[in-house]
Amino acid sequence: MKETKHQHTFSIRKSAYGAASVMVASCIFVIGGGVAEANDSTTQTTTPLEVAQTSQQETHTHQTPVTSLHTATPEHVDDSKEATPLPEKAESPKTEVTVQPSSHTQEVPALHKKTQQQPAYKDKTVPESTIASKSVESNKATENEMSPVEHHASNVEKREDRLETNETTPPSVDREFSHKIINNTHVNPKTDGQTNVNVDTKTIDTVSPKDDRIDTAQPKQVDVPKENTTAQNKFTSQASDKKPTVKAAPEAVQNPENPKNKDPFVFVHGFTGFVGEVAAKGENHWGGTKANLRNHLRKAGYETYEASVSALASNHERAVELYYYLKGGRVDYGAAHSEKYGHERYGKTYEGVLKDWKPGHPVHFIGHSMGGQTIRLLEHYLRFGDKAEIAYQQQHGGIISELFKGGQDNMVTSITTIATPHNGTHASDDIGNTPTIRNILYSFAQMSSHLGTIDFGMDHWGFKRKDGESLTDYNKRIAESKIWDSEDTGLYDLTREGAEKINQKTELNPNIYYKTYTGVATHETQLGKHIADLGMEFTKILTGNYIGSVDDILWRPNDGLVSEISSQHPSDEKNISVDENSELHKGTWQVMPTMKGWDHSDFIGNDALDTKHSAIELTNFYHSISDYLMRIEKAESTKNA
């Protein structure tokens, strides 16, 4: 009886939080719509794309492997049922509507900095020469502060005009962010069911600079690659008519004494994720109301951990926290980093769940959403260290964290990302990282830290009131904090510009297995835009519809927060299309088929109202990942025998 009451309490609270989120987001979207729809004010020449498929493209699309999840009751897909192509759509007549710029004034929370005239995001074009190479100069350039650029009022007028009219613009491609993805199409290997490791002959043991691997060719006019723009015609049926089995978060199950996996599984949550002691009582991030995935995998015989890192911080800070979560010790964000961005150098102290984690004792990382970016940056620091921290220590002396020294390869066996915005998301570009949303979110996080209600992991920004500090002094110190317009935040790292900086900094490790899982929960309309599927988690509908209407057609299919093209792989890194039976590949992104009907929350079961995906379907999805990781261990043990 007590357990049932606990279950209902958690579900009601979850629904209430979701409803509140929708109302707040909707109000912000209506009031600050001019700010939320950031587009270039200058007219750009767009390259028309052929929407119709050629017969060759059609054949290629149908040969793409399909995701297969091991379910208790297998469902068969009728391959004979092809999607009926829509007739050519006549272009809607263009209507000119004059809209005055929004006259709304942004109200700043009481604890916010007095005036924010310069937003943290910038409308700055990254030179192609910079994108084409990751030289030492470009690395140093990204270390420096970049001055914000003011957006003109004409931007707002154009954005509001776009919202008020039904004008259909020709499909276009953003040359800054999409041309590399067009030129870097997936390779489709033959799937023969073998598990032998296939290492690219071009891959060498020593890591080579990324500028030797990037195609520097200029973008050229191409037909839209069907596999990258819209959901494929054939998908494994992921929906289920069964209602989800609601389960309360039980007591933690201990790891097995003799686990099946030699290398532990480490799950890393994304933005606004709460795990462990910082989670609300009864909250279960990995599995939601459907299953406790950690306990489920431990009962199945796997050594499994759920990392707990900051919910709002930047990938740098989250990567550092992930390191100390595993190794133990007091978090050191770095002397150079903390001085540059204006926050405290040291954070919380972790006990350490894998204190013996070192070269030769690797782990498997599985990251959802922003967690995938965090993992990639941590792996980079393990191998190469942080050049800025090394230079600072050489100049000023003092202590430097072992993480920033580098030289720690062979600590990661595999990296698996789920719905990760490797190339950023328009949801952060045009909504999340706008001044209004930043101020509301950080003010709430600051108040929660002050009251001790919710730990957003931002105490290094001084959100916690000091002993003996008056309330007046505390409010003044918070108002003068650099957090309000800083780029050292999760919201900035999730923008396309912030993600591009991470992509330029990191590179593939030839000794690691990489894999990505992607969902799409939108469908194309007669006007060529994408709207949310029926049943999408309702807090994602607003952003899902917004992303589905952006100018760049390649970015429209999405899972409610992340575009399909962003989740598949970093834009400038090697990739290959695979399915569950494909042979294993090191040093390249193994891209699984897009999972139709899966939104951003479905992958972690965090939609209490979802009836499309059952608990068994969710657990089977993670069992398929576990099977893949065990195949890797078997292949590695055979190779080393």
From Swiss-Prot:
InterPro entries: AB_hydrolase_fold, Lip-like_C, YSIRK_signal_dom
Comp. bias regions, Basic and acidic residues: 73-94, 140-165
Annotated signal sequence range: 1-38
Function in brief: Has a broad substrate specificity hydrolyzing a variety of triglycerides and phosphatidylcholines.
Name under which the protein is recorded: Lipase
Keyword Signal: yes
Gene name in the database record: lip
EC numbers, comma separated: 3.1.1.3, 3.1.1.32
Membrane spanning residue stretches: none
GO cellular component assignments: extracellular region
Positions of the catalytic residues: 369 (nucleophile), 559 (charge relay system), 600 (charge relay system)
GO molecular function: calcium ion binding; phospholipase A1 activity; phospholipase activity; triacylglycerol lipase activity
GO terms of biological process kind: lipid catabolic process; phosphatidylcholine catabolic process; triglyceride catabolic process
Keyword list, A-Z: Calcium, Hydrolase, Lipid degradation, Lipid metabolism, Metal-binding, Secreted, Signal
